[in-house]
Structures are given as C-alpha cells and as structure tokens.
Design a protein with these regions (language model features):
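Enriched for short, Lys/Arg-rich terminal
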Residues: 1-25, 56, 64-85
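A short, surface-exposed loop/turn module that caps and links secondary-structure elements
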Residues: 29-54
Length: 85
C-alpha cells in the first residue's frame, strides 16, 4: 500500500492555538500515523458523510480520504464537546 499525503485544512490549523501543548503533540503524532494506516483502531465513519473520526484523549480529529489522489484531508480538530458543531 502506498503512503498517503496528509493535508490539513486551514480551519483545522487554526485550532492548534487553542489546544494545550501536551495534547497537541499527541494529536500531531496521530495525524502523521494516518499516512500509513487510514483507518486505525477506534476509527469511526461519520453518518451521512464521507468523513472519519479518530480520538486522541478528549480531542477528535475529523478527516476524509481521497483514494484517487492518495490524500488524507484533516478537516477539523477540536474538543469532543465542540468538534461536531
């Protein structure tokens, strides 16, 4: 299986400033691991959308996969209470 390129949407990058550094480091590691494993253990497909969710502590990472061009788009990162709004 080929490695997928990771692209983080600008709106998701803006969320980095509001996340504590100890959590941010783990979130970045989780995002990097998506290039090797698109659907890791605990990954959930969101209903009604072609998006997936993975957990990192109290934070959620929402992403979509473009198989034709081998890209994973990280769409949103946020606290579990706010990320789905």
């Amino acid at each position: 299986m080929e490695k997928y390129k990771i692209e983080i949407k600008e709106s998701a990058v803006k969320e980095f400033n509001s996340i504590p550094k100890k959590d941010l480091k783990k979130i970045v590691q989780k995002i990097r691991s998506l290039s090797d494993n698109l659907r890791p253990n605990g990954c959930v497909k969101l209903s009604g959308q072609e998006r997936y969710r993975i957990r990192q502590g109290d934070y959620r990472i929402l992403y979509s996969i473009e198989n034709e061009i081998l890209v994973v788009y990280v769409i949103k990162i946020g606290h579990r209470k706010e990320v789905y709004r």
